[in-house]
Amino acid sequence: MATTTTSWEELLGSKNWDTILDPLDQSLRELILRCGDFCQATYDAFVNDQNSKYCGASRYGKSSFFDKVMLENASDYEVVNFLYATARVSLPEGLLLQSQSRDSWDRESNWFGYIAVTSDERSKALGRREIYIALRGTSRNYEWVNVLGARPTSADPLLHGPEQDGSGGVVEGTTFDSDSEDEEGCKVMLGWLTIYTSNHPESKFTKLSLRSQLLAKIKELLLKYKDEKPSIVLTGHSLGATEAVLAAYDIAENGSSDDVPVTAIVFGCPQVGNKEFRDEVMSHKNLKILHVRNTIDLLTRYPGGLLGYVDIGINFVIDTKKSPFLSDSRNPGDWHNLQAMLHVVAGWNGKKGEFKLMVKRSIALVNKSCEFLKAECLVPGSWWVEKNKGLIKNEDGEWVLAPVEEEPVPEF
């Protein structure tokens, strides 16, 4: 295996990943996989059983989070904040899950991801402090995209800081039929912006919008680590990828100084905004976006050019058909599957190169939430499940749904 010396600035896109995507630099491969594993952790920890009073929360607490999701080198990273999003502003049902229990932990909000930093020991070894933000995609399958409005709307809320009332800038009463009459100017998809900027005064967890939570914590962390050469990496898959792109731009525009690198490494990202928004993103020299996309993934082409949307950032196009371990699936959900993409990244040697795993990564991970592996791999489909579907036997001999590891607590 050829060894290269690539600076951390280059890995974060200081040169737009020129010359290190093809052939794929080994350190960049490892960074992409790490970000993908951070994304996967948001799925693995999310309680999606609507019978549970904790549906929509994180199953694991911050202190043991990375251990419980079995992250490689878990001790190198610490979760410092959980993030929450709400559906207050005309968000279609199905994107944020609600518990059917009358004792639900919160009826207006869902856990939406986390902020993590490198540990003191890891930071000392690196000579700098890394800040990671992982935003959760939807736990629903492919059909979620059909219920989310694709209309573009003004990106003006992102051009200045959040409102004093805790909202991110989109006013109450905004609907998915809303559209700006002005066809010019910087625009993003209303659905993506709504999730990012909504707050709900009746919720203890989203009195501040996802946007306001993020900017407040990033400001605090940048001050705390100002002498440790901090960098910010955002990551997300699918819906989470769109929010990571918006948040990366927002942090570069409103939440950090020009000398702090802000990088989004996203997977299977639908289109976010128009050409003018892309120009705004590119105007920030410290802001870089790398989009890992499967060439046959249909969702990365949504909402589409007819509505004025364009690709944003540098595309790193891979092809799941190159892996000899994956079946010839006709399921678009498989083409969009995060673990399948990470599997291909692990063995990617260019469009013309032969697939060969370049890091130690179990192929069984592909089938965590799907059945994309060939039958001869002998790996059951959708194997990441709670024992007994989360039921435990209590002291009275009753089988009941287990509580989460730590009771959710508002953090802002």
UniProtKB/Swiss-Prot annotation:
<dbReference type="InterPro" id="IPR029058">
    <property type="entry name" value="AB_hydrolase_fold"/>
</dbReference>
<protein>
    <recommendedName>
        <fullName>Phospholipase A1-IIdelta</fullName>
        <ecNumber>3.1.1.-</ecNumber>
    </recommendedName>
</protein>
<feature type="active site" description="Charge relay system">
    <location>
        <position position="336"/>
    </location>
</feature>
<comment type="function">
    <text>Acylhydrolase that catalyzes the hydrolysis of phosphatidylcholine (PC) at the sn-1 position. High activity toward PC, medium activity toward monogalactosyldiacylglycerol (MGDG) and low activity toward triacylglycerol (TAG). Confers sensitivity to UV-B radiation probably by deesterifying membrane phospholipids.</text>
</comment>
<dbReference type="GO" id="GO:0005737">
    <property type="term" value="C:cytoplasm"/>
</dbReference>
<dbReference type="GO" id="GO:0071493">
    <property type="term" value="P:cellular response to UV-B"/>
</dbReference>
<dbReference type="GO" id="GO:0008970">
    <property type="term" value="F:phospholipase A1 activity"/>
</dbReference>
<dbReference type="InterPro" id="IPR002921">
    <property type="entry name" value="Fungal_lipase-type"/>
</dbReference>
<feature type="active site" description="Charge relay system">
    <location>
        <position position="297"/>
    </location>
</feature>
<feature type="active site" description="Charge relay system">
    <location>
        <position position="238"/>
    </location>
</feature>
<dbReference type="Pfam" id="PF01764">
    <property type="entry name" value="Lipase_3"/>
</dbReference>
<dbReference type="GO" id="GO:0009650">
    <property type="term" value="P:UV protection"/>
</dbReference>
<keyword id="KW-0963">Cytoplasm</keyword>
<dbReference type="GO" id="GO:0016042">
    <property type="term" value="P:lipid catabolic process"/>
</dbReference>
<keyword id="KW-0443">Lipid metabolism</keyword>
<dbReference type="InterPro" id="IPR033556">
    <property type="entry name" value="PLA"/>
</dbReference>
<keyword id="KW-0378">Hydrolase</keyword>
<feature type="active site" description="Acyl-ester intermediate">
    <location>
        <position position="238"/>
    </location>
</feature>
<feature type="modified residue" description="N-acetylalanine">
    <location>
        <position position="2"/>
    </location>
</feature>
<dbReference type="GO" id="GO:0005829">
    <property type="term" value="C:cytosol"/>
</dbReference>
<keyword id="KW-0442">Lipid degradation</keyword>
<comment type="similarity">
    <text>Belongs to the AB hydrolase superfamily. Lipase family.</text>
</comment>
<keyword id="KW-0007">Acetylation</keyword>
